[in-house]
From Swiss-Prot:
Domain of life: Eukaryota
Lineage summary: Eukaryota, Metazoa, Echinodermata, Eleutherozoa, Echinozoa
Family note: Belongs to the complex I subunit 6 family.
Name under which the protein is recorded: NADH-ubiquinone oxidoreductase chain 6
Source organism: Strongylocentrotus purpuratus (Purple sea urchin)
Entry-linked Gene3D superfamilies: NADH-ubiquinone/plastoquinone oxidoreductase chain 6, subunit NuoJ (1.20.120.1200)
């Protein structure tokens, strides 16, 4: 029953990200999504990956949230179509309850991903990803500079309103 509740909370967090036009609720939705996601991964048998996932989500939100809130022109944001969000959560949560009779079957499916019984070692898995990590850092740096340039020219953003006050 606990796993079902965590899946429903993950569903609520993801729909909050998709249906909110404001960065405030999107950041909240990602944090709401990361906590039960880490819990489900720890339930499946992994111990290190959920901690890394949670820290990456929280660290990413600490970087993205100030810049996205600087760009946002709304002082008091709201979630659009909150009734649709609640309806989708109810629809998909009923689907989750009807689909999984026994969650242990799902645990056996994902057991090969979190255990040490894979054919490829972790050294081979992480060895070829160094170039992609450097490329990802460069793309995030370009996006950060772009967000700063965009927010610098706008006079009606939240941070500009606080500075002018």
């Amino acid at each position: 029953m606990v796993v079902y509740v965590t899946l429903i909370v993950m569903l609520f967090g993801s729909t909050l990200v998709f249906y909110s036009l404001s960065p405030y609720y999107s950041a909240l939705g990602l944090v709401v999504f990361s906590v039960p996601g880490s819990f489900v991964l720890s339930f499946l048998g992994s111990s290190f990956v959920p901690i890394v996932l949670f820290l990456v989500y929280i660290g990413g939100m600490l970087v993205v949230f100030p810049y996205s809130s600087a760009i946002s022109p709304e002082r008091f944001p709201s979630v659009n179509n909150l009734g649709e969000v609640v309806g989708l959560v109810f629809l998909f949560s009923s689907w989750v309850f009807m689909s999984f009779d026994n969650f242990q079957d799902l645990k056996n499916i994902f057991h090969c991903f979190v255990s040490g019984e894979s054919l490829v070692g972790s050294n081979t898995f992480y060895n070829s990803g160094g170039v992609l990590v450097i490329l990802g850092v460069f793309v995030l740096l370009v996006a950060l500079v772009g967000a700063l340039i965009i927010s610098r020219g706008i006079e009606s953003t939240i941070i500009r309103a606080i500075w002018l006050w």
